[in-house]
Design a protein with these regions (language model features):
Chain B
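Aromatic- and glycine-rich beta-strand/loop motifs that create alpha-glucan
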Residues: 1-28
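Hydrophobic alpha-helical transmembrane segments of multi-pass membrane transport/permease proteins
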Residues: 25-47, 63-65, 171, 175-182, ...
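Membrane-interfacial helix-loop-helix connectors in multipass membrane proteins
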Residues: 45-56, 120-141, 186-202, 225-227
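Long, hydrophobic alpha-helical segments
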Residues: 57-73, 77
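Transmembrane helix boundary and interhelical loop/hinge segments in multi-pass membrane proteins
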Residues: 70-90
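Hydrophobic alpha-helical transmembrane segments that constitute the membrane-spanning cores
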Residues: 101-126, 146, 150, 183-184
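A structural motif at transmembrane helix-loop-helix junctions in multipass membrane proteins
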Residues: 134, 139-173, 223-228
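Junction motif at the cytosolic side of a transmembrane helix
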Residues: 211-228
Length: 211, 228
């Protein structure tokens, strides 16, 4: 591990560990994530994948070890808005349509110039369902209604917890396409998965979690 | 990276909560009906004697409105916690306390405002003299947001626990005592033709304090609730 790269890694964890009531959940864990890099977080159920992502998002506090963001000690305010977290709970309001949910997210997080919301919803595969209340959508469509934030919100680091769950084959390809596009423009992503998915086609970086 | 404008974020959140409340307008009607029924029970229980009802009218309306607000209180953050919206809100590049203040405002508009609208009706049923009516409305306009703000802190503190409804009531009602004393004091002073400005000013002062501090306390409490 080189200590002084020309550009510091976007995210760096050193001996990161987490305990719940003195029971180790995971760690110690060392990894680096540079801009343009996509990594797959692997591990069995209960190995702490979700916990790791929640720590990196800033929802849980770092118990042990060190976390650095763009070369500096991790601070909640420094990364707010630069990180997009998509957890098990999708953060969608069932009584609002996909379009309205997206408008709220864009209001809070800001949005990219391209694409527009209508275009983003079409590309994510919700054409014709934009104005349907989200609670009437299928599980896969709900997932897409949450994933559409990836297209619109301007975050550098994506933390995606099981983004492939409930998605069909075209949905999985869609997520892979989004990840590839994100990496190409200098974004980074951590993606958890417990199952075998055709992740980005090639051989991705892997972060292995041990309980 | 430039952060999205604060005003747009506030507007988006306020609009979202108001639209959500409107799509479930049956829930808005519930506390109103509850207050209507409770206020109707008093003449039945105490007899329709005008002098008695007149004397208790202000206090009955205040307590009824307070209890009706309590019914809707524990739903303030529950939906957002269950569907993950709160996580998205906490991680948004916006001051969390201000965002929560918007949520509390939306909650006040959808639960307390309808109650204030029917308060003259309730007070009229109990023969409150017309001269005291503006003071009652003023006291309610100051007391209800105060209760929303105090309630929001407790809702945030009990957010991690299940079945927090009863616990919430037990924690909030003692805090309501000074609010009720000042609000009812103002109304009864107005009824007796005495100066009523002092208790109303106290309510206003407490509201100003809560407006600043309660959202901050809510933000801290909800961060802790998520960090568990």
């Amino acid at each position: 591990m080189t200590a002084s790269p020309a550009r510091p890694a976007l995210l760096e964890a050193r001996a990161l560990a987490f305990y719940r009531q003195d029971e180790p959940v995971f760690g110690p864990l060392d990894f680096q994530l540079a801009e343009g890099e996509i990594a797959l977080v692997e591990g069995d159920n209960g190995s702490g994948k979700t916990t790791l992502l929640r720590i990196l998002a800033g929802l849980l506090h770092v118990e042990e070890g060190e976390l650095r963001w763009r070369g500096e000690a991790w601070q909640r305010d420094a990364q707010l808005g630069d990180v997009l977290f998509l957890g098990h709970h999708l953060g969608l309001k069932g009584d609002l349509s996909a379009r309205e949910n997206l408008a709220v997210a864009a209001g809070l997080y800001g949005r990219r110039d391209e694409p527009g919301p209508a275009d983003a919803l079409r590309r994510i595969g919700l054409a014709g369902y934009e104005d349907e209340p989200v609670r009437r959508l299928s599980a896969g469509q709900k997932k897409r209604a949450a994933l559409v934030r990836l297209l619109l919100l301007p975050a550098t680091l994506w933390l995606l917890d099981e983004p492939y769950a409930n998605l069909d084959r075209t949905g999985i390809e869609l997520v892979n396409g989004l990840l590839a596009q994100h990496a190409a423009r200098g974004g980074a992503a951590l993606v958890t998965s417990h199952g075998a998915v055709s992740f980005l086609g090639g051989e991705p970086r892997r972060i292995r979690m041990h309980a | 990276m430039s952060r999205p404008p604060l005003a747009a974020a506030c507007a988006a959140l306020l609009r979202r909560d108001l639209v959500l409340a409107w799509r479930r307008r049956g829930d808005i009607a519930m506390p109103v009906l509850y207050a209507l029924i409770v206020a109707t029970l008093f003449p039945f229980a105490l007899g329709p004697e005008e002098a008695l009802l007149q004397r208790i009218a202000g206090g009955v309306v205040l307590v009824t409105v307070l209890l009706a607000m309590l019914l809707a209180l524990d739903a303030m953050f529950r939906g957002d916690i269950e569907d993950g919206s709160l996580e998205q809100l906490v991680l948004a590049p916006q001051p969390l306390a201000l965002m929560l203040a918007m949520k509390i405002l939306a909650h006040w508009i959808t639960t307390a405002l309808p109650l204030i609208v029917i308060a003259p009706l309730l007070a009229g049923m109990l023969h409150l003299p017309g001269a005291a009516m503006p003071v009652l409305l003023l006291a309610l306009l100051l007391a209800t947001p105060l209760l929303s703000l105090l309630g929001a802190i407790l809702v945030a503190l009990t957010a991690g626990t299940r079945r927090s409804g009863m616990l919430l009531a037990l924690m909030l009602l003692p805090l309501c005592v000074p609010v009720v004393i000042f609000a009812a004091g103002a109304v009864s002073a107005a009824q007796q033709g005495l100066p009523w400005l002092a208790p109303v000013a106290w309510l206003g002062a407490a509201l100003a304090l809560a407006l600043v501090l309660a959202p901050l306390a809510c933000a801290a409490a909800l961060r802790i609730a998520l960090d568990a």
